[in-house]
Amino acid sequence: MTSNSKGVEILSIGTELLLGNIVNTNAKWISEQLSQLGLNHFRQSTVGDNCDRIIKVIQEISQRSNLLITTGGLGPTPDDLTTEAIAKSFNVSLFEKEYLWDEIKQKLSNSKLQDNYSSLRKQCFFPKNAQIINNPRGTAPGMIWEPIKGFTILTFPGVPSEMKTMWEETALDFIKNKFSDSYSFFSNTLKFSGIGESTVAEKINDLLNLKNPTVAPYANLGEVKLRITARAKSEVEANNLINPVKEKLKKEFSNFIFGENHDTLPGVLIKELAKRNETIVFAESCTGGLLSSSITSISGSSQVFLGSIVTYSNDLKNSLLNISEEKLKKYGAVSEKVCQAMATNVKEKLEADWAIAISGIAGPNGGCKEKPVGLVHISISGPNNHITNIKKTFNSTRNRIEIQTLSVNVCLNSLRLILLSKRK
């Protein structure tokens, strides 16, 4: 888009979206396509199946944007109101495209619905000068229409497979020719572990005000990401903008950064162990196998991961990991002493180079003043029987799966840092 353009908006239509009955994957996918085209995508809106509300939103968008892309509401039922609402927004009538009705009848000629598809005729009505977007996968066409100068609407059905096909076969070329310039967006994402989003943001306040490239932090559970995005004519030009910022961030945060883009913490750990030709095993209690699952979700994990013993009960800690009843009684299952013994013993039993043991109270019950919900002990046993013990107390307001997930993250990141220190 040219520098004086007002941008693109996405309008998702459907009460099921507002109620959370379905996830709006269409808006995400369209956003990605717009980014690849270098278009200025400023806003997304969602509205239910109410004609007056749809009209109000469309009229507002027409005053501030150049291009509106809608999904949903093109079907044959009474609550499919998109085309009608668009026409009313600009006080125009709808006219039947008779050839579309012929095409629909042809599509359904061998269908069991052929005697009951008269309601589909509704899908053949459009503003007089609208360009039709053919729907090869369904019966609801879309349209390209410029109701007022400088404002264009593209409509798509809500079915993702239909929308994507229509986009790729018809809409993409139109958007490229009319709205896209030679610029595209290119991004590089740095991934952090062991540091919070607010701490990261405080340290890079100056970078957050950059215009090109832009720097944006966002967080997942146990992980912070910094996305550096440049608008440029080529990947080389974009990298020239992105790389100086990336190097500054790497210098600032050093070991907190575990990877980029599609890297994952388990994947990075597996690669490092494979380079060292070393193996790992786990002894899990409070995570119940989640630590093992995180590793085995990565292709190639069998190179380094030998197996795991999940000892949820004290009896199994005793019988499978040789943790004495005396030690369990004296210190409790959730303790540094027991966790350290779990790591040492599973490493010896399964004959690995490294072992991680974890025991904790994931809640919501089971905590006390001395050992609250959220308390987790982690022990890492390495070559030469070197032991690293870690104690974490996660916020007790977190739910069970959050505490388990954060615990797994600490396990993986702690071993990553140990291996990193051994490089130096």
Swiss-Prot record:
Disulfide links within the chain: none
Coiled-coil region list: none
Pfam families with a match to the protein in the record: CinA (PF02464), CinA_KH (PF18146), MoCF_biosynth (PF00994)
InterPro entries assigned: CinA, CinA-like_C, CinA_C, CinA_KH, Competence-induced_CinA, MoaB/Mog-like_dom_sf, MoaB/Mog_dom
Taxonomic superkingdom: Bacteria
Protein name: CinA-like protein
Family recorded in the similarity comment: Belongs to the CinA family.
SMART domains given in the database record: MoCF_biosynth
